Design a protein with these regions (language model features):
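Interaction-mediating elements
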Residues: 21-145
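Bacterial Sec-dependent N-terminal signal peptides
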Residues: 1-23, 39
Length: 145
């Protein structure tokens, strides 16, 4: 009887975790309000190909993929987590990071093609292929070419 109970608990745990990692398409209007505002402000001319909710065990994130291949990922509260496109809007790049990159690396028409932020700071990729890592105080931590 104990073996059966342990087996049932294990099965429930496995299926619960599997179900917790659930992706589903949603309407843009179902995104958090902050995410909708962000899209209207910075990507108003971009056509959305797909919006989806990525549900994990404890929270959700949202991905918006554009017809031109660009993508924005949002946290559950609607704050942007990652922006990937041909030319990331400069207004979302912290000024110290943008100033550093334009002064030192973004000459001859290079653009920011990806920015990602998390609790440790920012990861930025420019169109030349170089990647930069900054801490939360916008200090350069690493360069990868």
């Amino acid at each position: 009887m104990k073996k059966l109970a342990v087996l049932l608990v294990a099965l429930v745990a496995v299926f619960g975790v599997a179900k917790a990692d659930d992706d589903r398409p949603i309407a843009v209007s179902k995104l958090p309000a902050k995410a909708q505002t962000f899209l209207k402000q910075y990507f108003k001319t971009s056509e959305v190909a797909l919006a989806k909710e990525d549900r994990d065990l404890f929270s959700s994130t949202y991905d918006v993929i554009f017809t031109d291949g660009g993508k924005v990922e949002f946290e559950s509260n609607g704050e942007w987590k990652e922006v990937k496109c041909k030319n990331v809007p400069t207004a979302i790049v912290p000024k110290p990071i943008y100033s550093f990159l334009t002064k030192n690396y973004m000459k001859q028409g290079a653009t920011i093609v990806k920015i990602e932020r998390d609790k440790q700071g920012y990861d930025v990729k420019i169109s030349t292929g170089m990647e930069f890592e900054f801490d939360t105080s916008y200090n350069l931590v690493d360069i990868d070419d």
